[in-house]
């Protein structure tokens, strides 16, 4: 287990040594609360776009199902006749310049794995730049848009926003409810009371704390041929090498077990870069990975490599709330 994995486990399961990090946590909280206070006071260089901005983000470190939810939002807004664009930091990307327009034929190294996945799946206009405000300006200069989705920009207070959606992993919750580095929180837990909606990935039902949503496996997709097959292609009891370089790899492995397959787990760091040698496992079995990993592996994939396509399925109550908010922000939509 890596040092990062051990720290993550301590945040969510508890460890007495974390008390040593509380002075650093206090400093961190002062910084993030100061940034938030300046934003609310309208101080500093804050950009307000001429179209509504919907931020989808986390207050916890680690995966929460954000990318599948963004894919849902893109398709849902398009179904309402809206022209949607996306801006993202582009974590791990090495583009020639910034801001950078992501195209479907680019590499994950150049565009970032999550932005490339979003563009390949939807064809949406997408701009990456750590400066989200600059990314929005650049995207609007190229595209006539009705709405901007900001991927993981909750703490980027230089960009004004009209709606804030925060995602939480229902199984992990907020861990020990402490901020970095003593806990997994990017902002204090009280921040949840200020956002427009909280969505809990894996929750059974909506609650006073927020809306529920789940990730629904929909197909097996071959990395070499692009062939899309039903989940029944793998019979119950099928053993597979399972590769996951995401924020919470165990969630992927649990999903495969829930489908009655027998995964041999191979967890990697979030946004990991791969080569063929790293993914050469024994015994010979089909290899199954996340779609986020697949965008980095097609160039050297073998014939029996697949990814599991998943779709975010929020509750009807969230969809009703979202439609009312879109109608308020974009009259006639």
Curated annotation (Swiss-Prot):
Enzyme class: transferase
Entry's Gene Ontology molecular function annotations: ATP binding; tetraacyldisaccharide 4'-kinase activity
GO terms, biological process: lipid A biosynthetic process; lipopolysaccharide core region biosynthetic process
EC number(s) recorded for this UniProt protein: 2.7.1.130
Catalytic activity: a lipid A disaccharide + ATP = a lipid IVA + ADP + H(+)
Superkingdom assignment: Bacteria
Family matches, as PANTHER family: TETRAACYLDISACCHARIDE 4'-KINASE, TETRAACYLDISACCHARIDE 4'-KINASE, MITOCHONDRIAL-RELATED
Function in brief: Transfers the gamma-phosphate of ATP to the 4'-position of a tetraacyldisaccharide 1-phosphate intermediate (termed DS-1-P) to form tetraacyldisaccharide 1,4'-bis-phosphate (lipid IVA).
NCBIfam families according to UniProt: lpxK
Protein name: Tetraacyldisaccharide 4'-kinase
Organism: Ectopseudomonas mendocina (strain ymp) (Pseudomonas mendocina)
């Amino acid at each position: 287990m890596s040092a990062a994995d051990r720290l993550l486990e301590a945040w969510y399961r508890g460890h007495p040594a974390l008390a040593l990090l509380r002075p650093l946590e206090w400093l961190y909280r002062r910084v993030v609360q100061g940034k938030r206070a300046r934003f609310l006071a309208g101080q500093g260089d804050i950009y307000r776009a001429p179209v509504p901005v919907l931020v989808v983000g986390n207050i916890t470190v680690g995966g929460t199902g954000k990318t599948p939810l963004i894919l849902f939002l893109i398709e849902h807004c398009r179904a309402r006749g809206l022209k949607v664009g996306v801006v993202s930091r582009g974590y791990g990307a090495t583009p020639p310049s910034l801001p950078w327009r992501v195209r479907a034929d680019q590499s994950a190294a150049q565009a970032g794995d999550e932005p490339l996945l979003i563009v390949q799946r939807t064809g949406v206009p997408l701009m990456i730049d750590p400066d989200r405000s600059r990314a929005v300006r650049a995207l609007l200069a190229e595209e006539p848009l009705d709405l901007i989705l900001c991927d993981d920009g909750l703490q980027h207070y230089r960009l004004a926003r009209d709606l804030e959606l925060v995602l939480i992993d229902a199984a992990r919750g907020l861990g020990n409810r402490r901020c970095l580095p003593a806990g997994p929180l990017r902002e204090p837990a009280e921040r949840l009371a200020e956002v427009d909606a909280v969505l809990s990935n894996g929750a059974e039902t909506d609650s006073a704390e927020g809306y529920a949503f789940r990730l629904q496996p929909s197909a097996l997709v071959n990395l070499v041929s692009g062939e899309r097959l039903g989940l029944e292609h793998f019979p119950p009891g099928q053993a597979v090498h399972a590769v996951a370089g995401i924020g919470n790899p165990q969630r992927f492995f649990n999903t495969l077990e829930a489908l009655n397959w027998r995964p041999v787990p191979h967890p990697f760091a979030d946004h990991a870069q791969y080569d063929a040698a790293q993914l050469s496992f024994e015994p010979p079995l089909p290899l199954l990975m996340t779609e986020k990993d697949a965008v980095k592996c097609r160039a050297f994939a073998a014939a029996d490599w697949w990814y599991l396509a998943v779709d975010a399925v929020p509750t009807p109550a969230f969809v009703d709330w979202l439609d009312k908010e879109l109608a308020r922000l974009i009259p006639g939509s």
